[in-house]
Amino acid sequence: MLTFLIPTAKEMVIPKESYPHLLPQPSQAILKAMAAMTTEDLAKAYRIKEEAAKKEQQRWQDMTSQQSLAYPAYQLFNGLMYRHIKRDKLTTQEQAYLTQQVYITSSFYGIIPANHPIAEHRHDFHTRIKIEGQSLKSYWRPCYNQFAKEHPQVISLLSSEFDDVFSKDCKQLWIGPKFMAEKEGQFKTHSTISKKARGAFLTACMENNCQTVDSLKSLVFAGFYYHPDLSTDHEFVYIKKEA
């Protein structure tokens, strides 16, 4: 069985379905540290203006006082990649695929199933904060490595932010799809192409119920197709021709 890892997103939209917010134990220390920060501290940690930091401070305070509601993560996150993932009107098989084989890597919650209920928050591995004297990446590394050991065959749709959270020896069987546009024999890639394609790729995997590495090679989605000559055992390259 294939396991997919996808990143979080800064952009969020509130879904209709909500739950009480239950925070995993490793996240408690992060919440305590974030909630103790002043607006000025948060502005520096996030590299944002103090006005925007006030909103984030309120979110952390609401979590601390257990006032926060939680929403299925794949519905709450609404970045470009998420908007290209099929999230509505799923078949029973597609819903099972999304909730059992797709996991979200978070600097606040750890690695969670795609439908895990989470609260509105702003947090990533670039957030300037120490937890128990460690960087966020060092703090989460044991949990992330344990997940990797339990799920050796991972299809990673993660950004470079996550490259060194996992130890190298845990990623020996990982495959990272790469998405490129071809025009007049020239290949190019950029974040917009990649984000849209990640969502379309995951949707195609769900719709085709891909369970083997070889099944990924026959996928055609949003104009992309597998390119064997550019691909390696650990990087599957998908090309889209541009006019």
UniProtKB/Swiss-Prot annotation:
Belongs to the UPF0246 family. GO terms for cellular component: cytosol. It comes from the Bacteria. InterPro entries: YaaA. GO terms for biological process: response to hydroperoxide. HAMAP family: UPF0246. It comes from Streptococcus pyogenes serotype M4 (strain MGAS10750). This is UPF0246 protein MGAS10750_Spy1880.
